[in-house]
């Protein structure tokens, strides 16, 4: 199966892509535009340094409060190099206990912590310091000449480390707050771990030893440190959660098992905007190719949008085909809402793939990481084609993101649900291999999922979920949707095998609930990644599905696969419980089913 993505970390016999590594050049990767690259590099270094300084100031301030509260006295002679009972007990619950003990013993404040709840402050603070150091160390490479593939991996890493420092800073602020929400902390820690994985995976196949070796050293143990944070935090809030493979979200009080037109927490004015005809919407920015708007391009509109806005900024993109390649709503562009003229009318398109010597992360035609992102009535497309392998149409890493009434069209790796909490409603998603993939906590509801005709000898796999740690609150929940064959796949008369998903990482988690599954889906339902990898640690579930492909009699018999028979278990993957849709603080909502009922 040479068409596959890179194999899972730590797996033997993993499959690699057929992409050839770019030759090492004695020039910067974007030699066609050296001045732009130098500006970008200098800007990246300055931004990274500023982010690091702010993060360290925040961590120091918060840590000072923790120090005062715990009455730290790290210098007690009898305690030197001997872990406290709290450290020993907490680290026993982690997946990396030796690193847990050693790292905490070397960090101020740990020995004075008397419980796991006290220790979590120190643990997150320590992890934040390590990520901040990695970001600072990485920034020193900004001016180094790199071949294109190494430059893409490096740029991805710097961005992801920056996002992780922000996520860990928010987690640290939250754990010292009396009003902390456990689901927020778990989400941000999960995102930091996912960011690290994406960063390291970007260097797979990179032959630039100097850059790769430097980054490998800078990133050492970061994944394990976040994993330990997740374990200690989970145990400090609910010890029972850690005992099972899936840590499921707790049921929210007051959430009814019925359809709500809009979330209760959504502002009345914004509720109207989501359903309001375009002609009645007062947009802050209008994009029109003919010049009859605020901007002619989407990239210009994104630049014009304010940073860290406390209100919804509406960008209306008029009908037309916008091919600007690698558009991105950055982390500081929060609360942006993109409104188009409808599926197939407003089209955001691109054709980047890994064959352009860039990471999968950078192939996205459109990407959004700013919290509270909403897109409505737009088509996102990557036209690179099946022969170009990984080619993302839409990548979402924004927390509390909503994609409503959109088309997402591609082949391999069409939709990258990268991280944080996401909700898709009434979307049409087209692809072939692993075309819904990533490690967000995401619910797709009332969506149509179309498998297309792949290349010869390829198999279609709808999902490739990459949950790496049992304490991450991530997974893909497909609820009240339709799994269908596109017209080109129908024409093959069943010669192409299509599967519901396969495990990209060890604790991969995907469920299909109350959905229609077409006859093109193989009777086994699910496909191995390779041999027996993750078959006993994954969580794949099916609940009350219908259609000719929903039969359970010949499904796989893996230890991690289950037919869900309990309503309580199925409820764990609903909007209300899996992504806490009814409690999101930013106003980023859409009509949805809170529970299971249709």
From Swiss-Prot:
Entry's transmembrane regions: 46-66
Membrane disposition: Single-pass membrane protein
Pectinesterase inhibitor 34: region residues: 81-232
Enzymatic reactions: [(1->4)-alpha-D-galacturonosyl methyl ester](n) + n H2O = [(1->4)-alpha-D-galacturonosyl](n) + n methanol + n H(+)
Domain of life where this protein originates: Eukaryota
Segments of this protein annotated with the region Pectinesterase 34: 284-582
UniProt keyword terms in alphabetical order: Aspartyl esterase, Cell wall biogenesis/degradation, Disulfide bond, Hydrolase, Membrane, Transmembrane, Transmembrane helix
Region Disordered, residue ranges: 1-40
Catalytic center residues: 413, 434
EC number, UniProt record: 3.1.1.11
GO-annotated cellular components: plant-type cell wall; plasma membrane
One GO process term, biological-process aspect: regulation of stomatal movement
Annotated InterPro entries: Invertase/methylesterase_inhib, Pectin_lyas_fold, Pectin_lyase_fold/virulence, Pectinesterase_Asp_AS, Pectinesterase_cat, Pectinesterase_inhib_dom
Compartments, as annotated in UniProt: Membrane
Family, per entry: In the N-terminal section; belongs to the PMEI family. In the C-terminal section; belongs to the pectinesterase family.
Function description: Acts in the modification of cell walls via demethylesterification of cell wall pectin.
Protein's name according to its UniProt entry: Probable pectinesterase/pectinesterase inhibitor 34
This protein's encoding gene: PME34
């Amino acid at each position: 199966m040479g068409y596959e993505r890179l194999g899972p970390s730590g797996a033997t016999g993993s499959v690699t892509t057929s992409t050839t590594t770019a030759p090492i050049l004695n020039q910067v990767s974007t030699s066609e535009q050296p001045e732009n690259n130098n500006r970008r590099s200098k800007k990246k270094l300055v931004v990274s340094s500023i982010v690091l300084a702010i993060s360290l100031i925040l961590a120091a301030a918060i840590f000072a409060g923790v120090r005062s509260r715990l009455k730290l006295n790290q210098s007690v002679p009898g305690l030197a190099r001997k872990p406290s009972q709290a450290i020993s007990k907490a680290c026993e619950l982690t997946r990396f206990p030796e690193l847990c003990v050693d790292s905490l013993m070397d960090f101020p404040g740990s020995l004075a912590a008397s419980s796991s709840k006290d220790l979590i402050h120190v643990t997150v603070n320590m992890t934040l310091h390590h990520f901040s150091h990695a970001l600072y160390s990485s920034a020193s490479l900004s001016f180094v000449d790199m071949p294109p593939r190494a430059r893409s991996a490096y740029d991805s890493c710097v961005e992801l480390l920056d996002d992780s420092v922000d996520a860990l800073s928010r987690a640290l602020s939250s754990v010292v707050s009396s009003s902390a929400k456990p689901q927020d902390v778990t989400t941000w820690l999960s995102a930091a771990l996912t960011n690290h994985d994406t960063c390291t995976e970007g260097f797979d196949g990179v032959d630039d030893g100097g850059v790769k070796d430097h980054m490998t050293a800078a990133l050492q143990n970061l994944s394990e440190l976040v994993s330990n944070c997740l374990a200690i935090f989970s145990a400090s809030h609910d010890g029972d959660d850690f005992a099972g493979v899936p840590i499921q979200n707790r049921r929210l009080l007051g959430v009814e098992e019925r359809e709500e037109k809009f979330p209760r927490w959504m502002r009345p004015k914004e509720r109207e905007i989501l359903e309001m005809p375009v002609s009645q919407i007062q947009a802050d920015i209008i994009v029109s190719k003919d010049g009859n708007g605020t901007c002619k391009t989407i990239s210009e509109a994104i630049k014009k949008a304010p940073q860290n806005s406390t209100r919804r900024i509406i960008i209306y993109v008029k009908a037309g085909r916008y091919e600007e390649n690698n558009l991105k709503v950055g982390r500081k562009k929060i609360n942006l809402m993109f409104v188009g003229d409808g599926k197939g009318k407003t089209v955001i398109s691109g054709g980047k793939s890994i064959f352009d010597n860039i990471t999968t992360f950078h192939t996205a035609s459109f990407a959004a990481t700013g919290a509270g992102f909403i897109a409505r009535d737009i088509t996102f497309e990557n036209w690179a084609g099946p022969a170009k392998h990984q080619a993302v149409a839409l990548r979402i890493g924004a927390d509390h993101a909503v994609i409503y009434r959109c088309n997402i069209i591609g082949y391999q790796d069409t939709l990258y649900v990268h991280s944080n909490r996401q909700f898709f409603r009434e979307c049409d998603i087209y692809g072939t291999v692993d075309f819904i993939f990533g490690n967000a906590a995401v619910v797709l509801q009332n969506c149509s999922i179309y498998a297309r005709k792949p290349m010869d000898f390829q198999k279609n796999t709808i999902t490739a979920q990459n949950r790496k740690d049992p304490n991450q609150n991530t997974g893909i929940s497909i609820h009240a949707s339709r799994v269908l064959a596109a017209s080109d796949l129908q024409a093959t008369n069943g010669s192409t095998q299509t599967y519901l998903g396969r495990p990209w990482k060890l604790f991969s988690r995907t469920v299909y609930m109350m959905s229609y599954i077409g006859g093109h889906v193989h009777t086994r339902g699910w496909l191995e990644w390779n041999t027996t990898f993750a078959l006993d640690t994954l969580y794949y579930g099916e609940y009350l599905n219908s259609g000719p492909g929903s039969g359970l009699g010949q499904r796989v018999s893996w230890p991690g696969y289950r037919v869900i028979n309990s309503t309580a278990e199925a409820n764990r993957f609903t909007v209300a419980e899996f992504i806490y849709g009814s409690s999101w603080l930013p106003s980023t909502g859409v009509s949805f089913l809170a529970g299971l009922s249709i």
